[in-house]
């Protein structure tokens, strides 16, 4: 069973990193990665249907324009059931508190521990065992 993941980060090299670190899962058809490079682009993509089913959004917090916390609030308004994992290089208590308050499923500090992230993804609703 394939599922989609939307990665939101204004740094284009993050897309390359995720493609590299999820190469095996992508080849096996476990995950289909989609990328947005701003909060606004993520909302445009979220308004459309994903094939296969979208099960999670991974969003950076610090982005120009709509930041990740504003994006999280908007996603939770439109799709309250959609898990959103916040990813940031700045893991301070205030950002963590706000992410929790706005409904983040996880708060991940960069550099991303991809083994841990993959374990967290396997626990999501809609993910085949």
How would you describe each model-predicted region?
Residues 12-35:
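Two-component/phosphorelay signaling modules centered on CheY-like receiver
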Residues 19, 35-56, 77:
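Acidic, metal-coordinating helix/loop segments flanking the phosphotransfer/catalytic sites
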Residues 58-60:
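Active-site T/S-Asp motif of two-component receiver
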Residues 63:
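Receiver (REC) domain active-site loop signature in two-component systems and cognate sites
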Residues 70, 91-108, 116-119:
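Alpha4 helix (beta4-alpha4-beta5 surface) of REC/receiver domains from two-component response regulators
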Residues 113:
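Receiver (REC) domain switch/active-site region of two-component response regulators
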Residues 117-129:
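Receiver (REC) domain switch/output surface
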